[in-house]
Amino acid sequence: MLAPLPPCALEIRGLVKRFERPAVDGLDLAVRAGEFYALLGPNGAGKTTTLRMIAGLTRPDAGAIHVAGIDALADPVAAKRVMAWISDEPMIYDKLTPREYLEFVAGLWGVVPALAQMRAQELLDWLDLAAHADERCEGFSKGMRQKVALAGALVHDPQLIILDEPFTGLDAASARLIKDMLRQRVQAGCSVVMTTHILDVAERMADRIGVMAEGVLIAEGTLDELRRLEGSGHATLEDTFLALVAKSAVE
């Protein structure tokens, strides 16, 4: 007998968002608990718009979004309590130290002070920020700011992490720390949905990959499944991705 599938951390049905043209057009997508899902596509494919709708930053024109079983459109506050959003431009409070920022964010989510302090210290240690925990963030590099932003996103122990191009502009050491943290969270049962143009990162980290083009999900599966779909055998993700997008444009 097959083992039951883990529950859905994220379920999207019929998602639509229009600007001058449809940015997202009838998207269906599901991500299981403990799954790392990479959402890929060329510029303008609708990836960031999709993530912003999941995170509650952009309102869809139609469709449904459920996060850990919560209707994110009907009860966005409850949905945000179980997810984290991290953009490619880290937004933190420059006049606070990392420790102050983490405890402040934890307080916003209702984490009791003692637990907030414990989680903050764990994250500072894990992300190699402990030596700078009591320095103001205003002088930090982008890599350090991105680590502070990630720590702030994780301090309330979310079930779903949404990342939009998290490795853009990071040095190798910072990128490695963040990748290690994400792997640890997935192993603990958390789910990750990530967009990236760095395809070798998606190839190494993702359990499943979705490919978008012109607001539509044109392919989805493991790397081997995408290879079979495209007929490319043992091609890299980059080769497979480019072939799928080109085929979609012709069709």
Regions found by a protein language model. Name each.
Residues 161-165:
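Catalytic Walker B motif of ABC-type/P-loop ATPase nucleotide-binding domains
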Residues 220-221:
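ABC ATPase "signature
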Residues 63-74, 78-79:
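Conserved ABC transporter NBD signature motif
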Residues 157:
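Conserved catalytic motifs of ABC-family nucleotide-binding domains
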Residues 55:
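Helix-to-loop junction immediately C-terminal to a conserved catalytic motif
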